[in-house]
Amino acid sequence: MKIILRKDVATLGDAGEVVTVKNGYANNYLIPQGYAIRATEGTLKALETEKKQQARKIELQRTNARELAAKIEQMTLKVLAKAGESGKLFGTVTAGDIAEALKAQGVDIDRRKIHLEAPIKALGKYEADAKLFMDITAKLSIEVEAEGASEE
């Protein structure tokens, strides 16, 4: 029997694939558990339509991510933190702090998508990566300054 997988099944394939299995396996396990549906002419057409819509959606997201990456790479984020006389911070600058600085400049990125090579524990200039989409990553330029320091 031909079926369309609705969920990933380790021994058969990924969601959306059309596979052939024995009737008993399909009728007694895969279909009742919601792992698959019968592959009829109508469901196959619906699957093709769904795949086309998904491809368009992914391409739109990829285009938006590229534009956002170009915008982010032009920015230099200024993060204010409490620091001692030697330039050492009281605490660390986290991905959450960087996400807040981005949000202040009109870019909303989840803090979990920002990757720091090492914790930021001193004043200075740093770089971080922000994963915007599957294969699109933007470089962030971060400048950590002392809170309350007068700009001259």
Curated annotation (Swiss-Prot):
GO CC aspect terms: ribonucleoprotein complex; ribosome
Function: Binds to the 23S rRNA.
Family in the record: Belongs to the bacterial ribosomal protein bL9 family.
Protein name, entry field: Large ribosomal subunit protein bL9
Pfam families to which the protein is assigned, alphabetical: Ribosomal_L9_C, Ribosomal_L9_N
GO function term, MF aspect, one: rRNA binding
Naturally occurring in which organism (per UniProt): Chlorobaculum tepidum (strain ATCC 49652 / DSM 12025 / NBRC 103806 / TLS) (Chlorobium tepidum)
An annotated GO BP: translation
Keywords: Ribonucleoprotein, Ribosomal protein, RNA-binding, rRNA-binding
Gene field: rplI
Record keyword RNA-binding present: yes
